[in-house]
């Protein structure tokens, strides 16, 4: 249900879900309060809730190779749904400086997770296959601040950028392996990440697009390799540990030029480079006894591309 006028807006609602893996109907309420002190400033206060059902996920179907041994994921018999309660407050501001249009968004957020899905310590089920069990953890908190800005100059230049500062922690240290210390930080969640895009059209047929993503340091699990499995491939014996990854800045550029072939037919030639600075993982595991899940960072090394597009 929503009530609004020029300065105020109140939205209250909810959602009912019935999942075949959950016994009861789940009600997820939400609310939003908007206030506009001026025409160009939007202030918002929001609350929402949600859940993840204890179903099979894509990664559950993926069979990993860990130190020369097959590893699989199974669900605990008493696995319950993961629930979230989220709060956010934001200020969205617009202003025009002559031919320049600008927008700045500042948002703070806090999410409380209960019955968090966690993967337990791997064990051998007896047939040479390692099993990691997905169960419910005690809980977690995710909080942070997001800044986003946009600048546009006529139809010639558009720039957009965003930066998020985030803290994500379990309520209690999570023991993910016998050989490794427990960790409170949630794995694969960087404390800092951001992006930017810039598009320039100096002349009508030509467009230049520049884009980049920044990923801060994060913790990634690297599984152990036993002395027995070390003989199977290139990776030496090692203990399991949580690796703190380096920072990554993935920058790409694309140039495109349009040709008029006929009244309503255009031909575009384009080309560019992805990951210009070769910001890429340097310590992949290799060989038959590798940990195939030990992958992080940008998905592609430096790559060149070219294309042709016909539109009519």
Predicted regions and their residues:
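Residues that define the transmembrane beta-barrel architecture of outer-membrane proteins
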Residues: 4, 25-27, 83-87, 139-143, ...
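Membrane-embedded beta-barrel scaffold of Gram-negative outer-membrane proteins
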Residues: 36, 44, 78-135, 141, ...
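Transmembrane beta-barrel strands of outer-membrane/channel proteins
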Residues: 12-16, 31, 45-49, 58, ...
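C-terminal beta-signal and adjacent terminal beta-strands/loops
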Residues: 114, 214-230, 257-312
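Residue-level signature of outer-membrane beta-barrel architecture
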Residues: 1-3, 16, 35-36, 49, ...
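Signature of Gram-negative outer-membrane beta-barrel scaffolds
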Residues: 1-38, 42, 53, 64, ...
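Repeated loop/turn-to-beta-strand initiation elements of outer-membrane beta-barrel proteins
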Residues: 7-10, 40-43, 97-102, 155-159, ...
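Gram-negative outer-membrane beta-barrel transporters
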Residues: 4-7, 103-104, 109-112, 133-225, ...
């Amino acid at each position: 249900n929503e009530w609004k006028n020029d300065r105020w807006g109140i939205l209250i609602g909810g959602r009912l879900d019935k999942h075949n893996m959950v016994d009861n109907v789940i009600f997820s309420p939400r609310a939003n309060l908007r206030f506009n002190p001026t025409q160009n400033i939007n202030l918002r206060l929001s609350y929402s809730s949600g859940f993840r059902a204890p179903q099979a996920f894509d990664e559950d179907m993926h069979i990993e190779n860990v130190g020369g041994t097959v590893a699989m994921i199974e669900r605990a018999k008493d696995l319950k749904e993961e629930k979230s309660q989220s709060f956010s407050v934001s200020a969205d501001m617009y202003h025009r400086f002559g031919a320049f249009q600008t927008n700045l968004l500042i948002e703070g957020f806090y999410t409380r997770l209960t019955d968090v899905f966690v993967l337990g310590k791997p064990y051998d089920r007896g047939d040479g296959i390692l099993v990691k069990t997905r169960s419910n953890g005690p809980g977690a908190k995710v909080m942070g601040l997001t800044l986003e800005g946009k600048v546009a100059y006529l139809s010639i230049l558009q720039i957009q950028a965003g930066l998020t500062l985030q803290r994500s922690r379990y309520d209690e240290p999570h023991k993910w392996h016998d050989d490794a210390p427990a960790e409170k930080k949630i794995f694969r969640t960087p404390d800092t990440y951001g992006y930017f895009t810039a598009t320039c059209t100096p002349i009508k047929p030509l467009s230049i697009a520049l884009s980049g993503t920044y990923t801060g340091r994060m913790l990634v699990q690297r599984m152990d390799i036993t002395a027995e499995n070390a003989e199977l491939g290139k990776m030496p014996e090692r203990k399991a540990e949580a690796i703190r990854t380096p920072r990554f800045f993935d920058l790409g550029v694309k140039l495109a030029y349009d040709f008029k072939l006929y009244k309503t037919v255009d031909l575009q030639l384009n080309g560019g480079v992805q990951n210009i600075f070769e910001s890429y993982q340097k310590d992949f595991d290799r060989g038959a006894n590798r940990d195939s899940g030990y992958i992080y960072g940008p998905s592609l090394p430096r790559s060149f591309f070219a294309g042709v597009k016909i539109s009519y």
